[in-house]
Amino acid sequence: MEFFNILQSSCNDVNLDFNDKKYNQFISYKNLIQEWNKKVNLTAIVEDEEIIKKHFIDCIKIFKASPIGEAKSLIDIGTGAGFPGIPIKILREDIKITLLDSLQKRINFLNIVIGDLKLKDIQCLHGRAEDYAQEAEHRQKYDVAVSRAVANLAVLSEFCIPFVKKGGYFIAMKGPSVEEEITVATKSIEVLGGKIEDIIKIDIEDTDLKHNLVIIKKVKETEKKYPRKPGIIKKDPLK
């Protein structure tokens, strides 16, 4: 019951209900990660306790950002093994979620997870954020965009902010040192229609992990020319 108690304690910390069903979904998810990681590079974190703490607990902490608890629709960009989108869905069955990733093998894995965990109102998209953000079905259609992907904030913002409707939020899950990234990215966030509203510091219990949630509110619509063409965003981030 150790893992149940760890997960329950983390959920209590963000005022979320936790029960046997959710626990079993998390354990099934963990087992699938370990099984699939032998053939698909999903994560370098493979031990039971590390997956629970460094992936699942880290994702639960995103509920410290109030928009996660209020949103009706969410897109997780560069979701990888499903972080944080799958944990959010386990804990909030009522939210409609889209998982976006550029690697088909990871999408195959995520579809297996969705089926095995019997998750509803969740879809996977294979492709680039730059392309989907220009499609009417996805552009400025989501209450919240989230990303735990490894990229600097200026680059992530151009990938993610165009998906968010005016009045919605982009929440970036960043490492312990974000001050310099924020300084560099502030102008690009503004150009894309966003404004930094808050930075929430996160500590993961019983680990050395310290993270930051950068909360960006969409205050105006994104100009049609953004995001720019694939490849340009990383080569020439907005300044």
Swiss-Prot record:
CDD domains the record matches: AdoMet_MTases
Binding site for S-adenosyl-L-methionine: G78, F83, A129, E130, R148
Enzyme Commission number, as recorded: 2.1.1.-
Recorded GO MF terms: rRNA (guanine-N7-)-methyltransferase activity
Keywords: Cytoplasm, Methyltransferase, rRNA processing, S-adenosyl-L-methionine, Transferase
Keyword flag S-adenosyl-L-methionine: yes
Compartment annotation: Cytoplasm
Coiled coil: none
A cellular component annotation (GO) from this entry: cytosol
Principal cellular location given in the protein's record: cytoplasm
Assigned protein family: Belongs to the methyltransferase superfamily. RNA methyltransferase RsmG family.
HAMAP family noted in UniProt: 16SrRNA_methyltr_G
Function as written in the Swiss-Prot or TrEMBL entry: Specifically methylates the N7 position of a guanine in 16S rRNA.
Protein name: Ribosomal RNA small subunit methyltransferase G
Taxonomic path: Bacteria, Bacillati, Bacillota, Clostridia, Eubacteriales
